[in-house]
């Protein structure tokens, strides 16, 4: 009997999904579970007021999946042994004025897989897809301040290009900046 073990040093298997019909019920469930786990552990992943449950996250996940399209929105997943470790969304607006850049949304790593390079691997793959498959020249993202995310993205070549001071009020005594980052060239 051959046992397949995932070592701490192994890299995740990456895949991209461009159509909702490519999402199995199992993957849909894992995406929802990941989003819940990330949010409820304090992650800045689109639901700013934890705790969240399946009935909060499932409709948003379904809406996101329903908008997948090869030229406009792609889902990139990272797995270890068929278990979802993380995911990210690449958005591209084909309108001529802004069609040369894309937007990154919802980067998240399941808490059980943090510290294993999942987020970095997802962002490297997203960059490659944006450049090589969509022909994009730059990527944009916005994220919550005071989470250490600025340093994470900077290590991957991103640079801060702006900040909305006090834009995000998480609690009466917890107001954060939203920072804007750019990756250019790809």
Where in the sequence are the language-model features?
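Conserved GNAT acetyl-CoA-binding A-motif
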Residues: 123, 130-143
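Short aromatic/hydrophobic contact patches that present stacked aromatics
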Residues: 106-108, 138-142, 180-182
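Acetyl-CoA-dependent GNAT
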Residues: 18-106, 110, 123-125, 129, ...
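Glycine-rich acyl-CoA binding loop
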Residues: 115-123
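Conserved active-site alpha-helix within GNAT-family acetyltransferase domains
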Residues: 120, 132, 145-163
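Terminal substrate-recognition subdomain of acyl/acetyltransferases
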Residues: 2-13, 23, 159, 164-186
């Amino acid at each position: 009997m051959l046992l397949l073990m995932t070592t701490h040093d192994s890299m995740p298997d990456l895949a991209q999904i461009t159509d909702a019909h490519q999402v199995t019920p199992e993957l849909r469930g894992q995406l929802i579970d990941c989003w819940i786990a990330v949010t409820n552990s304090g992650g800045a992943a689109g639901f700013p007021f934890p705790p969240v449950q399946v009935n909060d996250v499932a409709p948003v996940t379904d809406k996101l999946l329903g908008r997948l399209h090869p030229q406009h929105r792609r889902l990139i997943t990272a797995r270890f042994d068929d278990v979802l470790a993380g995911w990210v969304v690449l958005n591209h607006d084909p309108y001529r004025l802004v069609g040369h850049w894309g937007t990154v949304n919802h980067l998240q790593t399941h808490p059980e897989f943090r510290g294993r390079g999942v987020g970095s691997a997802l962002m490297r793959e997203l960059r490659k897809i944006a450049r090589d498959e969509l022909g994009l020249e730059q990527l944009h993202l916005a994220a919550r301040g005071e989470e250490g995310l600025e340093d994470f993205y900077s290590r991957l070549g991103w640079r801060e290009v702006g900040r909305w001071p006090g834009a995000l009020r998480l609690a009466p005594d917890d107001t954060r900046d939203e920072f804007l980052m750019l990756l250019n060239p790809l």
